[in-house]
């Protein structure tokens, strides 16, 4: 999920 750092709607 580190790669999803660019796409984190949960944040």
Curated annotation (Swiss-Prot):
Protein localization: Secreted
Tissues where the protein occurs: Expressed by the venom gland.
Signal peptide: none
Record's keyword annotation contains Secreted: yes
GO cellular component terms given for this protein: extracellular region
Keywords: Secreted
Residues passing through the membrane, by range: none
Other comment: Negative results: does not show activity on voltage-gated sodium channels, potassium channels, and calcium channels. All the following channels have been tested at 10 uM: Kv1.1/KCNA1, Kv1.2/KCNA2, Kv1.3/KCNA3, Kv1.4/KCNA4, Kv1.5/KCNA5, Kv1.6/KCNA6, Kv2.1/KCNB1, Kv3.1/KCNC1, Kv4.2/KCND2, Kv4.3/KCND3, Shaker IR, and Kv11.1/KCNH2/ERG1, as well as Nav1.2/SCN2A, Nav1.4/SCN4A, Nav1.5/SCN5A, Nav1.6/SCN8A, Nav1.8/SCN10A, and DmNav1, and the nicotinic acetylcholine receptor alpha-7 (CHRNA7).
Family label: Belongs to the SA81-like family.
Protein name: Venom peptide Sh42
Upper lineage: Eukaryota, Metazoa, Ecdysozoa, Arthropoda, Hexapoda
């Amino acid at each position: 999920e580190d790669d999803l750092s660019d796409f984190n709607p949960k944040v």
